[in-house]
């Protein structure tokens, strides 16, 4: 099993189900000194008729004054491969990064996904359907309300 720190739409049970990933032992975790934003260029833009502008997907970046809330997932080797495919690790969209997160039980080492620099775009917002997946996951796992509100604000 591999422990992954999931954030953004990867917290949404329906998204995980679509990827054929079981939500084993999910637990809330906090990644300090990182910031959440919709700064990863969406690879859906060319496929969606409603995309009249470039839209952002979830990403995290180092920032000493911020923190990112998410969940830890215990993934099998085949689920890790599915997640890697979904996140585009083989095509240069995201890369896997080791991190240490804080849980109620203490510090846990995990892997998360971070967008490659050449896939970043500033000052963008997500498509509404994507934002809803992010918010649904955050609410499902009962992340702090002020954090959920900050995600909502980023999406507008």
Language-model segments: what does each one mean?
Residues 1-156:
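Glycine-aromatic micro-motifs
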């Amino acid at each position: 099993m591999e422990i992954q720190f999931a954030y953004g739409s990867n917290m949404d049970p329906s998204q995980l189900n679509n990827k054929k990933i079981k939500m084993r032992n999910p637990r809330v975790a906090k990644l300090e000194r990182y910031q959440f934003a919709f700064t990863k260029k969406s690879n859906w833009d060319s496929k969606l008729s409603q995309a009249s502008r470039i839209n952002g997907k979830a990403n995290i970046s180092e920032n000493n004054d911020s923190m990112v809330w998410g969940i830890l997932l215990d993934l099998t080797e085949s689920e890790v491969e599915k997640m890697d495919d979904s996140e585009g690790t083989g095509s240069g969209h995201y890369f896997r990064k080791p991190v240490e997160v804080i849980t109620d039980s203490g510090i846990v080492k995990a892997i998360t996904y971070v967008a490659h620099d050449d896939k970043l775009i500033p000052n963008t917002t997500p498509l509404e359907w994507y934002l809803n997946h992010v918010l649904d996951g955050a609410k499902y796992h009962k992340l702090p309300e002020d954090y959920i509100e900050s995600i909502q604000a980023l999406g507008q």
